[in-house]
């Protein structure tokens, strides 16, 4: 005859009760913890922590104004309630523009300070030095301060750049010159370096209907007077000049004070241009612009920028680089805003990749997707005068 084991009724009831309360505790944890303990690294219910590497000291310390401009804008946002109720904190580290130092500091930001993301690190080699670490830890780097094509082409997951590449600038310049000098002879001066050789090909592609003469300037050469003599002998109706900032300025200083228009890139988009070049040469210049310039005093973004500096940093003189910092912070804030309250690194990357022709108070139109990780691809052709800027074109797409 089969024997049946007697069940302790009170123990069975107790066990069911424990399971019931355990179930309730689990459900409660799932509802509460995502805003705190289970949140993404660098995020809790009250704050988002970003990190950046900047040359806060040394010969490149002027770029430190970018980080300060960004911090001021974040402080302003925090006083408005932050992003989805969270305050923004930016941890700035001084890498002195040295890649080995950058890697050490980024490792501390990621492993010790546990930042949500890197934001607006300055420099190509400096930023590249930390990319293997960021990839291994799943940390994105939003809006690197570099104009190097290799940062975003081909696109890398979680890596976004800020500044227009020489190729982007070349497409815009070629597009504008083709429209405004149809069939006319153009001479293209460019520094004989890989990125500017590639850019010269982009210009040639846009100017297939124009007689085009190439004038490469050897790296390290300072024969700028002779180069201008060759340009004059060629008798062009327009000159395009592209190259790194330092040799480009020296080349322009050697130009005659009168002559055909000279088209150049975004490097010279500065309110202080009149201090660098003879005003008569500036009259010949057509420059690619992105952010509004300080002399555009009636621009809403410039008015806001000056007001924020008066409020939060009265000792801080506004500059091209403080505007840059404000602008890139505005872009970062938009990405975080679109990511929602349940903020994750992957969610922020997706939000960045879905910015379609977005514009801020200072930023030009931004178009990003999975294959386009370069933020500034829309530029305008402008004339910069001592007291005003005249925009000669609408926003032109350099993608």
Please identify what each model-predicted range represents:
Residues 42-47, 51-71, 93-99, 122-123, ...:
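Extracytoplasmic "Venus flytrap"
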Residues 49, 62-68, 80-153, 217-224, ...:
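Beta-alpha junction/loop-to-helix N-cap segments that form part of ligand/metal-binding clefts
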Residues 149-150, 157-258, 294-303:
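Extracellular/periplasmic Venus flytrap/periplasmic-binding protein
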Residues 209, 252-326, 385, 394-398:
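Extracellular/periplasmic periplasmic-binding protein-like sensory domains
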Residues 109, 113-122, 142-144, 185-190, ...:
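Periplasmic-binding protein-like
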């Amino acid at each position: 005859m089969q024997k049946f084991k007697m069940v302790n009724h009170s123990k069975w009831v107790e066990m069911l009760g424990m399971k019931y309360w355990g179930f309730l505790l689990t459900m409660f944890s799932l509802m509460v913890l995502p805003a705190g303990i289970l949140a993404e690294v660098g995020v809790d219910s009250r704050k988002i922590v970003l990190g950046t590497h900047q040359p806060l000291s040394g010969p490149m310390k002027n770029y430190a104004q970018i980080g300060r401009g960004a911090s001021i804008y974040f402080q302003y946002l925090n006083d408005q309630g932050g992003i989805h109720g969270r305050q923004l904190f930016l941890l700035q580290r001084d890498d002195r523009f040295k890649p080995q130092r950058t890697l050490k500091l980024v490792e501390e930001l990621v492993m010790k300070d546990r930042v949500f993301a890197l934001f607006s690190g300055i420099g190509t080699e400096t930023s590249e030095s930390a990319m293997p670490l960021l990839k291994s830890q799943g940390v994105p780097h939003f809006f690197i301060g570099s104009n190097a094509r290799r940062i975003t082409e081909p696109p890398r997951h979680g890596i976004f750049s800020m500044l227009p590449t020489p190729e982007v600038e070349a497409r815009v310049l070629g597009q504008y010159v083709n429209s405004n000098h149809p069939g006319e002879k153009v001479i293209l001066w460019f520094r004989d370096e890989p990125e500017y050789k590639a850019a010269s090909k982009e210009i040639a592609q846009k100017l297939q209907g124009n007689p085009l003469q190439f004038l490469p300037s050897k790296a390290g050469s300072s024969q700028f007077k002779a180069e201008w003599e060759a340009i004059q002998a060629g008798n062009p109706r327009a000159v395009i000049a592209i190259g790194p900032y330092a040799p480009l300025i020296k080349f322009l200083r050697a130009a005659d004070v009168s002559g055909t228009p000279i088209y150049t890139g975004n490097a010279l988009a500065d309110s202080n241009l009149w201090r660098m070049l003879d005003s008569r040469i500036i009259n010949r210049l057509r420059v690619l612009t992105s952010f509004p310039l300080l002399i555009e005093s009636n621009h809403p973004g410039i008015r806001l920028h000056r007001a924020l500096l008066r409020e939060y940093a009265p000792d801080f003189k506004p500059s091209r680089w403080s505007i840059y910092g404000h602008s890139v912070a505005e872009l970062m804030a938009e990405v975080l805003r679109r990511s929602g309250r349940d903020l994750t690194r992957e969610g922020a990357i997706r939000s960045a990749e879905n910015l379609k022709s977005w514009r801020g108070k200072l930023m030009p139109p931004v178009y990003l997707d999975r294959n386009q990780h370069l933020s500034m691809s829309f530029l305008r052709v402008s004339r910069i005068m001592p007291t005003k800027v005249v925009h000669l074109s609408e926003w032109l797409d350099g993608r």
